[in-house]
Regions:
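N-terminal FAD cofactor-binding segment of flavoenzymes
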Residues: 25, 29, 45-94
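C-terminal helical "tail/cap" subdomain of flavin- and related membrane-associated enzymes
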Residues: 344-407
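N-terminal Rossmann-like FAD-binding beta1-loop-alpha1 element of flavoenzymes
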Residues: 3-36
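FAD/FMN-dependent oxidoreductases across multiple families
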Residues: 113, 208, 258-369
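Residues in the short beta-alpha loop(s) of Rossmann-like NAD(P)-binding domains
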Residues: 39
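Helix-loop-beta segment of a Rossmann-like dinucleotide-binding subdomain
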Residues: 97-116, 153-155, 252-255
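Short beta-strand to alpha-helix junction loop
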Residues: 59-60, 106-125, 178, 184, ...
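Predominantly flavin-linked oxidoreductase catalytic cores and closely associated redox partners
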Residues: 129-276
Length: 407
């Protein structure tokens, strides 16, 4: 720990994945890191009210798993010992995208199939083993305290739920907002006299339904998952991943209002309608383990904080405060971990400069779409052939999603 930070305190608003990982990064710098969470947190691996997406499909791609392993050494082996599935995401997962199957072959890109409650609960448990981490649950942050003369956030006003005491001030040298989509950061910034960031909204009309099933060895030819992507003009998709406890978690849905039904027969019929049959072949006969769980997400929203020339000192927003993305296709926690890997090296710096660093790789995805290569007038026959070549896809995934090459 740096000597000049030893006597300083950081406060993190929110104990979801973004908040837990931000706290872990800050623990290497600050003498005390306090995580403030409004929910009562479960002792085990249970879904909770503040994470409604936690009942749906989650997992870690290779880069996300690597960063988590760096933050918490031995994490992967610990999760596998408890039933999670680690494996080569190219060799052991069936991918169907834009009319082609990705050829399964070893890639040395190892992901982790794990439920969101188990992932979050395990990260929280490991985090609390650090001596300078403190958790304050069932405690709501009313607002950060702000010194207008210095242009600096100096702490947070908190209210304990169910307690008789009034609001109290928790002083801090650095405050991180990781409170999720419902954060009041835009309103706080406006009240402090800072400009609102430009917002970029893309309506997607996404809706999906999830159910868990009993997993048998003969399912999916022994593979650990299947992803059937939406390929326009067919906007329907399906995701099936192995989970701890010999379970499958299956999510089917669609974009632009083409949502999966929430009754048993409708759910199975929707799975039958997907472009490939692997998910349907499992759900039509497997034993359901829970009710059908719907989720809707209307739009992706990005706030361009990196464009602001002024921002309060001692204040930072991570994860969904910057980019709100739908989470059912596994990339959400990986983007969070990728951002934390960059954030870990620069607490205390200016927010706008840090945002420019963290978001420098957030170019529109269509620029890197292999299907786009096939559609371009200027594409050559060689380019079109390579558009579904696994080697080309490996390069795309390594460079723009997983941030590493195999080997």
């Amino acid at each position: 720990m740096r000597e000049d930070y030893r006597n300083k305190r950081a406060v993190v608003i929110g104990a979801s994945m973004g908040g837990l990982l931000a706290a872990r990064a800050l623990a290497d710098y600050y003498g005390e890191v306090t995580v403030v969470e409004r929910d009562a947190l479960p002792d085990g691996y249970e879904p909770r009210k503040g994470v409604p997406q936690g009942r749906h499909t989650h997992g870690l791609l290779a880069r996300g798993r690597e960063v988590l392993e760096q933050l918490f050494p031995g994490f992967t082996d610990e999760m596998v010992a408890q039933g999670a599935t680690a494996g080569d995401i190219v060799d052991k997962v069936l991918w169907f995208n834009h009319g082609f199957y990705l050829h399964n072959s070893p890639s040395n890109l190892h992901g982790l199939a794990i439920s969101r409650p188990m992932l979050e609960g395990s990260v929280r448990r490991r985090l609390l083993q650090l001596p300078n981490i403190r958790l304050c649950e069932r405690c709501a942050v009313l607002e950060p305290t702000f010194d207008r003369a210095q242009g600096r956030v100096t702490g947070v006003r908190v209210q304990s739920q169910g307690g008789s005491d009034g609001a109290q001030v928790m002083n801090a040298d650095f405050v991180v907002d990781a409170s999720g989509r419902g954060s009041s950061s835009p309103a706080w910034l406006d009240a402090w006299g800072y400009p609102k960031p430009r917002e970029e909204l893309i309506k997607i009309g996404l809706g999906y339904v999830t159910r868990q099933y009993r997993r048998l060895p003969e399912h999916l030819r022994g593979m650990s998952g299947a992803i059937i992507a939406a390929c326009p003009p067919d906007w329907r998709f399906g995701v099936m991943l192995s989970q701890e406890g010999d379970r499958w978690i299956v999510t089917v849905g669609g974009y632009l209002g083409d949502h999966a039904p929430t009754d048993d027969s409708g759910f199975v019929d929707f799975a039958r309608s997907l472009q490939k049959p692997e998910i349907f072949d499992v759900v039509r006969a497997a034993e359901p383990l829970c009710p059908l769980m719907p989720y809707q997400f209307n739009a992706n929203l990005r706030r361009h904080y990196q464009e602001l020339s002024r921002f309060p000192a001692g204040f930072f927003g991570v994860w969904r405060r910057l980019v709100q993305l739908q989470s059912c296709l596994r990339s959400g926690d990986d983007r969070c971990l990728h951002g934390i890997a960059g954030f870990a090296g620069m607490p205390g710096g200016r927010h706008a400069r840090n945002c420019r660093t963290l978001l420098s790789g957030s170019e529109p995805a269509h620029r890197y779409s292999l299907a786009n290569c096939r559609r371009q007038r200027s594409s050559t026959p060689a380019c079109r052939r390579r558009a579904h070549d696994p080697g080309t896809l490996h390069q795309l995934v390594h460079r723009k999603i997983l941030s590493r090459r195999p080997g």
